[in-house]
Amino acid sequence: MLREMARFTIDIQMRFRDIDGMGHVNNAVYLSYCELARTQFYLKHNFKRSLHEIDFILAHVDIDYVSVAEWGDRVQVAVWPSKVGNTSFILSYEITEKKNGRHIA
């Protein structure tokens, strides 16, 4: 089932609290954006009827920051299964600026 799933993209509603003292989205906030995309991905593909029924362990996370997101940017997060094994799978993410497609992370 997971192997056939295509890229899933959501728009992120940036919040004022996401912005740090330097005027851009704080590095830790990107994980929250990915979490939101991941849960919507699971619900869209009916992994279970509710999030409480999804059994998985998040074992590893890494992010390559490419450019900054600033207040007013329209951010999108794409998620897709990039590797599927017998007992585990890897989800990949791409965070972009919606208006111009600029790669953020």
What are these regions (language model features)?
Residues 2-60:
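Hot-dog-fold acyl-thioester-processing enzymes
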Residues 2-10, 60, 65, 69-74, ...:
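HotDog/MaoC-like acyl-thioester-processing domains
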